[in-house]
Design a protein with these regions (language model features):
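GNAT-family acyltransferases
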Residues: 1-95, 160-172
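Conserved GNAT acetyl-CoA-binding A-motif
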Residues: 121-132
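Conserved catalytic-core motifs of GNAT/GCN5-like acyltransferases
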Residues: 132-133, 145-165
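A short, internal acetyl-CoA/4′-phosphopantetheine-binding micro-motif in the GNAT/acyltransferase core
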Residues: 68, 82, 95-106, 134
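Phosphate-handling substructures
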Residues: 197, 239-297
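Domain-level recognition of soluble alpha/beta enzyme cores
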Residues: 329-358
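Conserved acetyl-CoA-binding loop-helix of GNAT-fold acetyltransferases
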Residues: 97-100, 106-119, 123, 142-146, ...
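Active-site-proximal alpha-helix that buttresses catalytic centers in soluble enzyme cores
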Residues: 176-247, 344
Length: 372
């Protein structure tokens, strides 16, 4: 699962119409109620209604987010976050209203979407979040409790339906952990020693982009492969943040054997494709993708355990990073690797709730030809 909360913009009109069309055809109620406003086909009016955040005639200001599945490029649901509670919302409604489109229910989206919504509540300075659901809606209750919800009581709403009131104390829930993986800039491929291979002059110039991308990001720590090209790629950014770079041998690139990189740009049954087809296979003297993945994930899990709620940068390599992405999204394969092989620089942002991946998003890349 790879999701993100987004504000509605004209670029997302197809995703909106797809989701709302399914909901309408199902003859089930739209949820949250905030997305029911007007006819969604009148997009400009619909959007203007969603963008009302100022208090109007006693109306509590709110923020509406749609849940985008980044892998499938579809809306799977939406959340409505009220900035504070009036007397009515304190009884029924709460801070967060949420809903998942009919075809995507019972897949874990609601739990993950609420987790991201809680981070938006944290940004608004809400220390304790109230969520409510109908007593007979077992799925909603489970999603709320999965996010730390504690049942306070049950009340009868204005429709005569029993409703459960849950409180979520954000002080008891660490913020999400954000990891920026930075694949190194272009390196001197003719330099055969993998550990000491430097960046090209162009690669050194490109490395300034890392600091620019992270300029407004409050980074807590920098980690890196011990290989020079990765260290040099994030050095300017670490210096700009006044932080040291902590190296971890497990974050190094795959050990290449005989003709290990043959076939990076070729078709056919090359060593590259054999490795991606069988994570246990490697060329003589080389390292399998399974071994690379195991040590990189081991290092990442330890870093996540020690840095919960923090923002981190990890300097990495093309193959090493690809095995990490494959671990969390097994569909990531050889063609995905070939798509990014020339991206030197390449920055991917992953967010985690503890050890659980919430989102994975490509942030920035520079296309530089891979040197065979």
């Amino acid at each position: 699962m790879n999701i993100k909360l987004v504000k509605l913009t004209p670029a997302y009109r197809p995703q909106l119409e797809d989701m709302m069309g399914e909901w309408l055809a199902s003859e089930q109620s739209f949820s949250p109620c905030a997305i029911r406003k007007n006819d969604y086909h009148d997009f400009d009016r619909y959007l203007s209604q969603l963008e009302r955040t100022k208090e109007e005639s006693g109306r509590v200001p709110d923020s509406v987010f749609f849940c985008l599945d980044l892998d499938r490029d579809i809306f799977v649901g939406a959340v409505n976050i009220r900035h504070y509670l009036n007397e009515d919302l304190l009884q029924c409604g709460g801070h967060i209203g949420d809903g998942i489109r009919p075809s995507e229910r019972r897949k874990g989206y609601a739990t993950a979407m609420i987790r991201l919504a809680l981070e938006e509540c944290r940004k608004l300075g809400i220390p304790k979040v109230l969520m409510t659901c109908d007593k007979d809606n077992v799925g909603s209750a489970k999603s709320i409790m999965n996010n730390g919800g504690v049942l306070e009581n049950e009340v009868i709403n204005e429709d005569g339906v029993w409703e459960q009131r849950y409180w979520i104390d954000l002080e008891r829930i660490p913020p999400v952990t954000t990891v920026y993986f930075v694949r190194h800039c272009q390196s001197e491929f003719s330099h055969r020693d993998d550990r000491t291979r430097p960046l090209t002059a162009l690669g050194m110039e490109d490395s300034a982009a890392v600091a620019q991308v992270l300029h407004e990001t409050a980074v807590d720590a920098f980690y890196c492969s011990p290989y020079r090209r990765s260290l040099d790629t994030i050095a300017k950014a670490a210096q700009a943040h006044g932080l040291p770079i902590q190296t971890d041998e497990r974050l190094r690139e795959r050990q290449s054997g005989e003709d290990g990189n043959f076939g990076l740009k070729d078709d056919g049954d090359t060593p590259l494709r054999k490795r991606w087809r069988d994570f246990g296979w490697c060329e003589p003297g080389g390292e399998s993708l399974g071994a690379v993945q195991e040590r990189n994930i081991q290092a990442l899990r330890e870093i996540l355990s020690e840095s919960r709620g923090k923002t981190l940068v990890i300097g990495t390599h093309g193959t090493a990073l690809s095995t990490v992405l494959n671990y969390y999204r097994p569909s990531f394969g050889c063609e995905d690797f070939l798509r990014i092989v020339d991206w030197m620089l390449y920055i991917v942002r992953l967010t985690f709730d503890g050890q659980r991946l919430l989102t994975s998003e490509e942030i920035f890349h520079i296309d530089r030809p891979y040197q065979k």
